[in-house]
Design a protein with these regions (language model features):
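Conserved lysine of the Walker
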Residues: 17
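Post-Walker A helix-loop "phosphate-sensing" segment adjacent to the P-loop in P-loop NTPases
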Residues: 26-34
Length: 206
């Protein structure tokens, strides 16, 4: 592969897309693969109170700064590194003191619930995968993750799931399944399946 290519891994919250992206990162190695979480591009909300931030709909397309991400992807495709923002999920805003350096390696993976929603992002993808996982399993994974890793209460996770997460999944995320080059189940996969997917990605981007 002579220059950077962008691929996407999309799917519902807690579908396994982040795990898949990092499995591909591990297989390809850091010299060839880097991962950009779409979550890093949540719009900064430092100008409103924490209470107001907690009430925002984080599963709607407007929650993400897709323009900034597209600009960064264009820079990578031009051979330039970028400083991706880092998002603080406990405070619902960007960490203004830190960034994540992303270099124009062979394959840059954009992973997130709406990675396939934005036309301006789809325009630069060389390959795309949608991770399809049962809703009940996704909820159980989300509950465990948000309580243990993001400082959330079980009640708040339940409330957010019913109010925005699941409705927005049905409206904006699930329809993008049809836009993916490939659909994988998120219940489980083995090393062989990851290796075969990596081969297909390499073939598509060469």
């Amino acid at each position: 592969m002579a220059r950077c290519r962008i691929i996407s891994v999309a799917g519902g919250t807690a579908s396994g897309k982040t795990t898949l992206a990092h499995d591909l990162f591990r297989l390809g190695g850091p010299e060839r693969v880097q991962v950009i979480p779409l979550d890093s591009y949540y719009r900064d909300q430092v100008n409103i109170s924490l209470e107001e931030r907690a009430l925002r709909n984080y599963d709607h397309p407007d929650a993400f700064d897709s323009t900034l991400l597209r600009n960064h992807l264009d820079e990578l495709l031009s051979g330039n590194g970028v400083d991706a923002p880092i998002y603080n999920f406990a405070l619902h805003c960007r960490d203004g003191r830190q960034v994540e350096r992303v270099e124009p390696v062979d394959v840059v993976i954009v992973e997130g619930i709406l990675a396939l929603h934005y036309r301006e992002l789809r325009e630069v993808y060389s390959y795309s995968v949608f991770v399809d996982t049962d809703d009940d399993l996704r909820f159980q994974r989300r509950l465990k993750r948000d309580v243990s890793e993001r400082g959330r209460t079980e009640e708040s996770v339940h409330t957010q799931w019913n109010a925005t997460v699941h409705p927005m999944h049905l409206q904006y995320c699930a329809p993008t399944r049809a836009l993916a080059a490939e659909v994988m189940t998120g219940e489980r996969w083995d090393e062989g399946a990851i290796a075969q997917l990596w081969k297909r990605i390499v073939s598509a981007v060469e």
